[in-house]
């Protein structure tokens, strides 16, 4: 520092002093600078989470932490995902990492009682896990511990790594109120395995019947081949009384999602607080599939003398409606009906009533729309 006499005309030039903040690693027994942490770990702040338009914490993690792979086996809203840290460690046993939220280990497997805890398969074709109950806006940071240090911190449960989640806490200063909301729509990104409409399919089969006549009936002429096709076409491509069926449009729709989040934080040198409420509602692209979630979070910290008291409460209520997306309830995957059933397999009768069964090779000829309306699953 330099002291000069005051004058009416002074020019002050400040030189820059570049300083960088060390990345912090949160473990089971304290916080460390990354430069001083000897284990294999990676951390991510909420700055990368806030602008990702997804209700799933796993979707926001995907591709942001080295060594962590996240894959989904279902497009069901709220469905659990596979989380693998440095690949699979076992063929028969579980490979899910331990999840620790604010120092408390939680169940990292499937929370649905009707499903396998590791694969999610079973009566409910999708399942759900603890991360589905979290509001990503409440997360301050996520640390992934990848090596043997995880087992030394948390025991054998951490053999597949640890996902350490730290939620937001209050800070001294003016009380700040934050509100954000977003809306969105979803549909099938790819027209997977396009199918023929009724007229095109009938014309193709008609030509196939004529070709069959040419190859297998002696003395076939153009007229007799056409007569053979006319006599047999309705056995393979009959037009229903109320028109051709469009199973893709009948089974799938445009999905939607809405998300509302409100939080308040503040405090002084002694007492700091953070509180939040959120509501999320997501409708899937299959009828009767969706997720409704409400969360509440309160973190309070108070210092008196040499002592410090931290109190944290997190409440979450979630309702998940599951269609037969991956094969469930002794029925096949509802998405496969698009390819098993054709335009000739009627959805409704001539009076517009939904048929219980339809002529086709799907689920012993049961109408998948009827099944979905009467066999969907609900997880609370």
Predicted regions and their residues:
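Short, acidic, small-residue-rich periplasmic hinge/interaction motif at the N-terminus
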Residues: 2-50, 58, 71, 180
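Short, glycine-/polar-rich solvent-exposed loops and beta-turns at beta-strand/coil boundaries
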Residues: 3-8, 71-79, 154-159, 253, ...
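Flexible glycine-/small-residue-rich
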Residues: 14-16, 25-30, 72, 85-89, ...
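Solvent-exposed, polar/charged alpha-helical surfaces in well-ordered, non-transmembrane soluble domains
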Residues: 35, 39-42, 47, 55, ...
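Residues embedded in well-ordered regular secondary structure
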Residues: 43, 64, 76-81, 91-99, ...
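Non-catalytic regulatory/gating segments with a bias toward low-complexity or hydrophobic composition
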Residues: 61, 68, 103, 142, ...
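Surface-exposed extracellular loop regions of Gram-negative outer-membrane beta-barrel proteins
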Residues: 134-150, 159, 257-325, 379-380
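Outer-membrane beta-barrel translocator/channel fold
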Residues: 318-340, 346-352
């Amino acid at each position: 520092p330099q002291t000069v006499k005051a004058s009416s005309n002074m020019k002050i030039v400040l030189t820059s002093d570049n300083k960088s903040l060390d990345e912090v690693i949160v473990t089971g027994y304290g916080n460390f600078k990354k430069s001083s942490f000897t284990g294999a770990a990676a951390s991510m702040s909420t700055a990368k989470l806030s602008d990702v338009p997804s209700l799933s914490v796993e979707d926001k993690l995907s591709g942001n932490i080295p060594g962590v792979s996240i894959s989904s086996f279902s497009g069901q809203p709220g469905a659990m995902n596979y989380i693998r840290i440095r690949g699979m460690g076992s063929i028969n046993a579980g490979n899910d990492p331990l999840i620790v939220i604010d120092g408390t280990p939680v169940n990292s497997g499937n929370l649905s009682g009707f499903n396998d805890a590791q694969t999610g398969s079973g009566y409910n074709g999708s399942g759900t896990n603890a991360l589905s109950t979290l509001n990503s806006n409440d997360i301050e940071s996520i640390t992934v511990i990848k090596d043997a240090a995880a087992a030394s911190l948390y025991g054998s449960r951490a053999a597949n790594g640890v996902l350490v989640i730290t939620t937001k806490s209050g800070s001294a200063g003016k009380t700040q109120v934050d509100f954000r909301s977003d809306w969105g729509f979803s549909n099938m990104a790819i027209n997977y395995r396009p199918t023929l409409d009724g007229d095109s399919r009938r014309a193709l089969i008609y030509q196939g019947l004529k070709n069959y006549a040419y190859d297998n009936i002696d003395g076939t002429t153009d007229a007799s081949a056409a007569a053979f096709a006319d006599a047999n076409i309705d056995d393979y491509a009959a037009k229903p009384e109320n028109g051709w069926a469009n199973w893709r449009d009948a089974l799938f729709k445009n999905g939607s999602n809405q998300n509302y989040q409100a939080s308040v934080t503040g405090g002084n040198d002694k007492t700091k607080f953070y509180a939040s409420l959120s509501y999320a509602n997501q409708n899937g692209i299959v009828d009767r599939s969706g997720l409704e979630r409400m969360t509440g979070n309160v973190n309070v910290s108070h210092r008196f003398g040499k002592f410090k008291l931290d109190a944290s409460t997190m409440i979450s209520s979630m309702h998940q409606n599951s269609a037969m997306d991956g094969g469930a309830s002794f029925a096949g995957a509802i998405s496969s009906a698009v390819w098993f059933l054709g335009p000739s397999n009627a959805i409704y009768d001539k009076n517009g009533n939904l048929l219980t069964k339809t002529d086709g090779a799907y689920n012993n000829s049961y109408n998948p729309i009827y099944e979905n309306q009467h066999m969907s699953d609900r997880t609370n």
